[in-house]
Amino acid sequence: MYTLTPAAAGRSRRKVIFLGLRGIPEVQGGVETHVAALAVRIAARDWQVEVLGRKPYLPSPEPYVWKGVTVTPVWTPRSKSFEALLHTALGLLVAARRKPDLVHIHAIGPALLTPLARLLGLRVVVTHHGFDYDRQKWGDLAKSVLRAGERMGMSFAHARIGVSKGIVDSVRLRFGVAASFIPNGVETDLPKFGTSYLDYIDVAPRRYVLCVGRIVEEKRQLDLISAFARLNDPDVKLIIVGTADHKGGYLHAVEAAAAATPGVVMTGFQTGEALAQLYQHAGLFVLPSSHEGMPMVLLEALSHGTRCLASDIDANLALDLGADSYYPLGDVAALAAAMRMKLATPDSAADREARAARVMASFGWSPIVDRTIEVYESALVAWKAGGAHRGGTGLKKHLEIGGH
């Protein structure tokens, strides 16, 4: 029977380093939102937590502490093609000097370097956030690299996490390794927010459709703008929140379509209370994506009790919102009709409270943190046992949360 290895000399608490994301806090992205919430809560469980962020995205060029989490900027070029891999490589060299108990790599692109982490003597957990090679923005070479990253991460990590059951099942089937289903979480006990930001952008509560996300091809904002134009309702606006990390043709196309369509407001990236106000007072939230892992923005909208409409991709269907909350991906006419129907249906305070209660019961952070720490402990046991490739003895137990 194996026991956990002692914490590194000179440390009274275990330490985990997060790697593979742009950074925290208030950095655009589902992985970034996930890690920001998770890292703070793990730090509150008496772990030392450090996030190695990408210097161009962080508010300070020097290390800082945010809510008990140390955030360390690591240089990387701001490049669509190379920044994630180069930053991960440099981050692993930093981590090797830090000698943490664990490195937690997020996403399959950065996971390509899991074998390097092993060669550096690091114990590794990898979270699979989605099949990124299905994203429209990537060419054939990038997709091949992402598939290789998935294979390396799943094969060489000491323990693996998938944010959806579909990911976990796929990993088990294709790679023959154990993985634990731990979904994204939502904040509970949200306060009632005012409307100061709504007043600032001149929109009225319940009289707008909201879309939140990075402006990239697979988020399909152009579909939503086209569908909104078909509503032809001057009393309703469309609010698009988000921006692109790298300027390009799709961003310009969305900006042009928004400018040409009356009632469309682009706010850029928002966070904090401004974003919370937009979620809480929306008449309808729409997620028209062609690709998601576990749709964080959809969970956030639901946690505020907001009505939702989403494309019928597997990741969205897994949330089981009801048949009237989905439409066929890419069908602009069907999206417009579904939006019209949703907006015409009364939505009471009781309806919104029930919606929020359901998602909070299934996706609250406390059990997610519990399960993540269990996976960390199993990874340490696997390292001690030398059984990392097949998951080690500590991965025999797979408690599944998420309400399904």
Question: Model-predicted segments: where are they?
Answer:
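Nucleotide-activated donor-binding/catalytic signature segment of Leloir-type glycosyltransferases, i.e.
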Residues: 251-273
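Conserved donor-binding/catalytic core segment of Leloir-type glycosyltransferases
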Residues: 17-19, 198, 202-230, 239
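Conserved acidic donor-binding segment of nucleotide-sugar-dependent glycosyltransferases
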Residues: 324-333, 341-347
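Membrane-proximal helix-turn-helix segments that form the acceptor-binding/catalytic region
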Residues: 93, 119, 143-160, 254
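Short hydrophobic beta-strand element within catalytic cores of glycosyltransferases
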Residues: 303, 307-310
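Glycosyltransferase donor-sugar binding loop
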Residues: 55-57, 186, 212, 237-252, ...
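Aromatic "clamp/platform" in nucleotide-sugar-dependent glycosyltransferases that forms part
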Residues: 290
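Short alpha-helical donor nucleotide-sugar binding micro-motif in glycosyltransferases
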Residues: 269-270, 277-282
